């Protein structure tokens, strides 16, 4: 469990051409603020983080929640704290799954170097408002290097960012039961060179997942609060196969979306781009608003605001 790996003093942990296996669904790896995780896989031998059933051959195509996932917490800025504490070391927030507090003032904070690794069959539901993802980046800074990563069959989001400035390159997200990519609380990093597939997925109650390829927020309680979420997304192919939106933008988020392909199934998907509320729509033309360039939208309709649709 988290208590087995969470340390208050700064530590450095390294994985080299390794297989990390958890044998219970509540085990998860937490990197605390000030600590570093170095993953040094290779294209021929990536580091694999997975559940025990993956080794025994008992894992199924729809398996999830075989272990909790990877949580990385840093000392960068975010906006989910008391307004008086914004931009100070007192601006901290408590991570999901009792993973500890995160946040600070160093947007160049370094939580390690991670390349060529897979996170498979992860995620855990504590409550509907407290869930572990495949990977959670909590106020992680831009000094952290993340590249060549796949997250597969996460029971919540594939990758979620809570503030911070960390970027990711060369990534694949498949089989998430909630959103494939999710950000909130002032994330200002980047995601480049990726493939994201939001697939038809059977839920535990027999229903089908109708979540989004991207679910993007700033802060629900104060949509204009700085630092505002404004990541750059480039050279990514998004495929929404069923149910939800390909891009759902809400709660004041901004986005730079460049040189990408955004596709959905027009019969089964809710929308290609859904700007979900009036406040986010109003921010579209402002600095750190919404910018789309060199991007192909391959679907029959786009929601600009709730109950407003443009056909093209």
Language-model regions: role of each:
Residues 16-34, 41-42, 46-156, 160-308:
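Extracellular beta-rich repeat passengers
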Residues 7, 11, 39-42:
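Beta-strand repeat architectures
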Residues 2-9, 302-309:
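Conserved small/polar residues in nucleotide/adenosyl-binding loops
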């Amino acid at each position: 469990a988290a208590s087995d790996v969470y340390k208050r003093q700064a530590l450095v942990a390294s994985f080299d051409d390794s297989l990390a296996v958890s044998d219970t669904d509540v085990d998860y790896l937490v990197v605390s603020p000030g600590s570093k995780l170095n993953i040094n896989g290779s294209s021929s031998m990536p580091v694999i983080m997975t559940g025990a059933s993956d080794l025994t051959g008992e894992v199924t195509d729809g398996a999830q929640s075989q272990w909790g996932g990877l949580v990385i917490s840093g000392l960068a800025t975010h906006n989910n704290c008391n307004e008086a504490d914004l931009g100070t070391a007192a601006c901290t927030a408590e991570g999901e799954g009792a993973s500890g507090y995160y946040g600070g003032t160093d947007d160049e904070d370094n939580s390690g170097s991670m390349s060529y690794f897979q996170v498979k069959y992860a995620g855990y539901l504590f409550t509907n408002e407290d869930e572990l993802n495949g990977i959670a980046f909590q106020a992680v800074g831009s000094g952290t290097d993340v590249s060549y990563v796949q997250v597969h069959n996460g029971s919540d989001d594939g990758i979620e960012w809570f503030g911070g400035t960390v970027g990711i390159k060369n990534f694949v997200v498949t089989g998430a039961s909630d959103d494939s990519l999710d950000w909130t609380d002032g994330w200002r990093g980047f995601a480049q060179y990726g493939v994201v597939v939001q697939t038809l997925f059977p839920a535990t109650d027999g229903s089908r997942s109708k979540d989004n390829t991207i679910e993007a927020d700033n802060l629900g309680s104060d949509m204009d609060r700085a630092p505002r979420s404004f990541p750059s997304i480039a050279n990514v192919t998004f495929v929404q196969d069923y149910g939800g939106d390909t891009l759902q933008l809400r709660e004041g988020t901004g986005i730079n979306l460049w040189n990408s392909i955004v596709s959905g199934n027009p019969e089964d998907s809710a929308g290609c781009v859904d700007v979900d509320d009036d406040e986010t729509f109003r921010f579209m033309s402002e600095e750190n608003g919404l910018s789309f360039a060199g991007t192909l939208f391959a679907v029959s309709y786009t929601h600009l605001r709730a109950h407003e649709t443009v056909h093209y």
